[in-house]
Amino acid sequence: MGRKFFVGGNWKCNGTTDQVEKIVKTLNEGQVPPSDVVEVVVSPPYVFLPVVKSQLRQEFHVAAQNCWVKKGGAFTGEVSAEMLVNLGVPWVILGHSERRALLGESNEFVGDKVAYALSQGLKVIACVGETLEQREAGSTMDVVAAQTKAIAEKIKDWSNVVVAYEPVWAIGTGKVATPAQAQEVHASLRDWLKTNASPEVAESTRIIYGGSVTAANCKELAAQPDVDGFLVGGASLKPEFIDIINAATVKSA
């Protein structure tokens, strides 16, 4: 059984009620491959999760953009995994580079978050990736392996984890890793999983690419053997997200 193509849309801190309803309408009307070819998950801000979930076409799912590292309680401003489960939200994005950089989330903290979210029944899009300085220093795989190791040390079952490789230098900058650069890191990550988790985990875990994915570059990226989908930022707020979802047909062709 091959790895089903996965396309996530991270709306980040964007949107009004009107804008969200327009995006959902576009998604609902878009012509996309069937759900046995591609899995689609969109991640609106917390406040819009219920409305998006209730209005979105049935075969698409929603993800939260974060959740707290343990059970809820006296943690003002946080949202717990239990609350997301209670709302019927199946997915959560954890370890996004913006949270690592702006909010100081460490590899260990992200590992704890992933483990707790999984323990409560959520599926996780776990983000890893290097900065431009780290890439230029030749330490891309060291950085990505350390981030992945912090997760691997806390979990045994990878069946509900999608790994998103997002080179920080390519997020929202218009710069994009070349298909060859993306493939190189994805293949190295899969090798790391083979050695440090198991060959089965390496074979079955989807590794998706994020970082200035557009309708123009998605098909070439999707053609890479170890690129199993995308985590899309800015383009997920636009009609071109439908084109990106359709890149899944490259794999099934």
Swiss-Prot record:
InterPro entries: Aldolase_TIM (IPR013785), TIM_sf (IPR035990), TrioseP_Isoase_bac/euk (IPR022896), Triosephosphate_isomerase (IPR000652), Triosephosphate_isomerase_AS (IPR020861). PANTHER family: TRIOSEPHOSPHATE ISOMERASE, TRIOSEPHOSPHATE ISOMERASE, CYTOSOLIC. Belongs to the triosephosphate isomerase family. Its EC number is 5.3.1.1. It catalyses: D-glyceraldehyde 3-phosphate = dihydroxyacetone phosphate. Substrate binds at N10, K12. Pathway: Carbohydrate biosynthesis; gluconeogenesis; Carbohydrate degradation; glycolysis; D-glyceraldehyde 3-phosphate from glycerone phosphate: step 1/1. One of its GO terms (biological process) is gluconeogenesis. GO terms for molecular function: triose-phosphate isomerase activity. It is an enzyme of class 5 (isomerase). One of its GO terms (cellular component) is cytosol. It is found in: Cytoplasm. Keywords: Cytoplasm, Gluconeogenesis, Glycolysis, Isomerase. This is Triosephosphate isomerase, cytosolic. Homodimer.
